[in-house]
A protein has these predicted regions:
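Active-site-adjacent helix-turn-beta-strand microarchitecture at beta-sheet edges
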Residues: 1-28, 125-126
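Short, well-ordered strand-loop elements centered on a beta-strand within folded domains, enriched
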Residues: 1-9, 161-173, 303, 384
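Glycine-rich phosphate/diphosphate-binding loops and the adjacent beta-loop-alpha structural elements
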Residues: 24-53
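Short secondary-structure junctions
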Residues: 34, 39, 226-228, 319-323
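Generic detector of short, aliphatic-rich beta-strand segments that form the cores of beta-sheets
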Residues: 37-41, 45-48, 234-237, 331-335
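Second-shell loop/turn segments in exported
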Residues: 45-52, 102-105, 200-205, 294-301, ...
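Feature captures C-terminal
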Residues: 54, 58-277
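Primary recognition of N-terminal secretory signal peptides and signal-anchoring hydrophobic helices
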Residues: 274-385
């Protein structure tokens, strides 16, 4: 990226304009929220706003339907952490739940087109597999493509593959049939994308004169304080997250305490419970009388392979401490030196294909002397035995 010119920032005219802009966004109280609009995430890194209906999405949807007069509208949670917190609301708070200055369009769609659009949006989730204890997301489809629909009732069956998930869609209490016609409201960006992908065929019938942001400001002025409201018009089906299973609770605690990486793009699964637990407190440091955690697995040669940075972190303060870094295109180890890098969460799963790899020889610099050691590369880290 391009670094901002600090000298330009310090020019009196530029600095004054910046300060006035920030003050305008943050200091003008537009209204109030009577309570938080988003539920607390059960699992760190898994946004509740993308796995259940929430007041943020329903607020934006209500505003879009009221301004457009459409039958159905679509809303994405542009940022996973977007929320309206209880208390004063300013421009910055409203811009946080709607990042862009979009305007709205309406277009006529058939029931078949509507369901195709909903399937397109539902591809933002991964398919649920037996043993998965969380919902996860398709890393190829970012959150701003993950639309939720207001004006319809529907279910998303995540046990099915993408393209076959939308079920039991109703409009005004009746099943949505392929030959029905609806007026759909979307923002200008989404309309263009849907047209380009051939999901909808109709032409724009109406365009708003105000941006969605301006609509939200006006709505707040008329509904102060804002009350979080959720109509629960959609839900995820086809999954059994085993919420009463104590093993699930253990895995989630590891995520929430930072010892296990977030299962955002790959669900935790009870089938790998023993494997994951086998990496927790699996390193004993005798002279410190402590245990540590290192990502590890047993390789095809029967030897245990450990992520080197985890070992370096664990051995800090012991007689065997060492630092590990990347220098001159190779792993560099400095003995009798404290590790100065970060602690990485454990991987959710080390695939069998990685564990079955034949180790490759790599060059490691130890106190400036190059040696050759067998190693396996996974997710940007070397595992050594």
């Amino acid at each position: 990226g391009i670094e901002p010119d600090q000298g330009l920032r310090e020019l009196p005219a530029v600095k004054s304009a910046q300060e006035k802009t920030v003050s305008f966004i943050q200091d003008n109280v537009l209204g109030h929220a009577s309570a938080d609009f988003q539920p607390v995430d059960e699992i760190k890194g898994i946004p509740s706003g993308r796995i259940e209906d929430t007041a943020v999405i329903d607020l934006i949807g209500t505003v879009q339907l009221e301004n457009s007069g459409a039958d159905v509208t679509a809303v994405a949670l542009f940022k996973d952490t977007s929320d309206l917190k209880k208390g004063d609301l300013n421009y910055g708070n409203l811009f946080d739940i709607y990042k862009y200055p979009n305007v709205l369009y309406t277009v006529k769609v058939s029931g078949a087109e509507m369901k195709a659009y909903m399937e397109w949006a539902a591809a933002c989730w991964n398919q649920w597999k037996e043993g998965d204890v969380s919902i996860s997301f398709n890393p190829q489809k970012p959150g701003y493509l993950h639309d939720h629909f207001i004006g319809l009732n529907y279910e998303v069956n995540l046990s099915k593959p993408a393209g076959e998930r939308i079920e039991n869609v109703t409009f005004q209490g009746k099943p949505l049939t392929d030959d029905m016609t609806l007026t759909l409201c979307v923002n200008d960006y989404r309309y263009t994308g849907l047209k380009n992908e051939g999901i909808i065929s109709g032409e724009k019938e109406w365009e708003s004169s105000a941006s969605v942001r301006d609509m939200l400001v006006a709505y707040l002025a008329e509904h102060d304080p804002l009350e979080p409201a959720v109509d629960h018009n959609w839900k995820i089906t086809g999954v059994d997250l085993q919420k009463d299973n104590p093993d699930r609770a253990t895995l989630i605690e590891l995520v929430n305490t930072g010892r296990l990486e977030s299962p955002y793009s790959q669900s935790l699964n009870l089938d790998t419970y023993s494997e994951v637990l086998g990496m927790v407190d699996n390193v004993k440091v005798s002279d410190l009388d402590k245990t540590g955690t290192a990502a590890s697995f047993v390789g095809a040669d029967g030897a245990p392979y450990f992520r080197m940075r985890d070992l370096a972190y664990t051995f800090n303060g012991s007689k065997n401490q060492f630092n590990v870094s990347w220098a001159d295109g190779k792993v560099a180890i400095t003995t009798s030196t404290a590790y100065d890098g970060e602690l990485f969460p454990l991987p959710v799963r080390i695939p069998a294909a990685v564990q079955e790899q034949i180790p490759a020889d790599i060059t490691v610099s130890v106190d400036g002397t190059d040696i050759t050691v067998p190693a396996i590369l996974f997710d940007g880290h070397y595992y050594l035995t």
